[in-house]
């Protein structure tokens, strides 16, 4: 099936997540960069029903993409700094406060890591800025609907606001790595000049989560790790 080319104005990440995670479709890559206005779907219906199935799939996808476009346009009207202020109403943990409080801790920690651990005082300001805004997209419409895009949308919105590349790249990638696999961390080529900034912010986020939740009594057990602390610890080791 296909969809209106006007939707190609949406970030490719939004298009792909909508098709893959929400509709279970396969996006189609364009000959050059980006996606084509087409998708593939698998069905177990009789071949004579293929055209009707395709039309229904196009209709459902178009509705999802219209929603995504609405969120995209609405979110860009509000700067990330204002979204950051709204994090005061988003709870991180009952004993550790809001995501605004977590962001404040991350800002201080990321600056210290960049300067005193990684030895890059020149990256300290960018690390602090990125850490401050890293969770701001949790207060956006897009992430409210597409939770799997958290971090990614923050980076995209930061890029739209023309924040420095090391800042938006660090925000975009700060949840990574999410597994111990060698390919789980972003490649240095993708991070460019922002590799140190990303490392400082990602470490600050993971260390704040691990230490804070251990202090709050949320230690993982052999059968229970609801906050993914083992995964966070693996992430710290992969970054280092």
Predicted regions located by residue number:
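Amphipathic alpha-helical "coupling" segments that flank catalytic cores
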Residues: 1-240
